[in-house]
Amino acid sequence: MLEQVCQLARNAGDAIMQVYDGAKPMEYARKQDDSPVTAADIAAHTVILEGLRTLTPDIPVLSEEDPPAWEVRQHWQRYWLVDPLDGTKEFIKRNGEFTVNIALIEQGKPVLGVVYAPVLKVMYYAAEGKAWKEECGVRKQIQVRDARPPLVVISRSHTDDELTEYLQQLGEHQTTSIGSSLKFCLVAEGQAQLYPRFGPTSVWDTAAGHAIAVAAGAHVHDWQGKTLDYTPRESFLNPGFRVTIY
């Protein structure tokens, strides 16, 4: 099933690129929570939703662009969790740092994850405790790697006082910034050692990257030390968290 989901992510990426390259209008707007949405978000959502319903008709889908009501999903034990275009701000800025995120959740845990960056033509994916990176048709297994001083990856679009204070207290380190779920993937492939997050995220922002990071040997915990949990709850918001190899 993993390969079929990877192909779905590629197809969604193709739909996004039609808008990104100007073949279709962007039609940029704002949602109720003031987050941006484009025609590319909707196009990718449609591709993934139709594909997953064909691939696994018995597994429900929670997508950022059409989340079912709480009453519908409150008893879900197994479901797909999708962000058709993670990093819409990066898409609008045209810096290429946006991704397609698809995760399979079982009993609150992300057991399969796919993150595809269509501009960069890089795919990360994980299942059954193993993680891979595919680039230019070449696939390699990835795992975390220690480095001193550690490289800390932070959000390109979201900074806050809590993060600034945390970094000041961290000790010797280097920082880099990148958009979307690629932060999880940098830790997973050994390029970075820590991704701290204080600002708001939603479950669809993190689940696929979470699966990949954990399969590569990282830990994804909230600031109380608990593993991020995707058991259905009324709010889609995550607590603050960190992705770390330590």
UniProtKB/Swiss-Prot annotation:
GO terms for biological process: 3'-phosphoadenosine 5'-phosphosulfate metabolic process; phosphatidylinositol phosphate biosynthetic process; sulfate assimilation. Gene3D superfamilies: 3.40.190.80, Fructose-1,6-Bisphosphatase, subunit A, domain 1. Mg(2+) 1 binds at residues 64, 83, 85. GO terms for molecular function: 3'(2'),5'-bisphosphate nucleotidase activity; magnesium ion binding. The keyword Protease does not apply. Induction: Strongly repressed during nitrogen excess. Its cofactor is Mg(2+). It is a peripheral membrane protein. It comes from the Bacteria. Its EC number is 3.1.3.7. Its main location: membrane. It holds the Pfam family Inositol_P. Disulfide bonds: none annotated. Substrate binds at residues 64, 85-88, 205. One of its GO terms (cellular component) is plasma membrane. Keywords: Cell inner membrane, Cell membrane, Hydrolase, Magnesium, Membrane, Metal-binding. Mg(2+) 2 binds at residues 83, 86, 205. It is an enzyme of class 3 (hydrolase). It is found in: Cell inner membrane. It catalyses: adenosine 3',5'-bisphosphate + H2O = AMP + phosphate. PANTHER family: 3'(2'),5'-BISPHOSPHATE NUCLEOTIDASE 1. Belongs to the inositol monophosphatase superfamily. CysQ family. Converts adenosine-3',5'-bisphosphate (PAP) to AMP. This is 3'(2'),5'-bisphosphate nucleotidase CysQ. It comes from Salmonella typhimurium (strain LT2 / SGSC1412 / ATCC 700720). The lineage of its organism: Bacteria, Pseudomonadati, Pseudomonadota, Gammaproteobacteria, Enterobacterales.
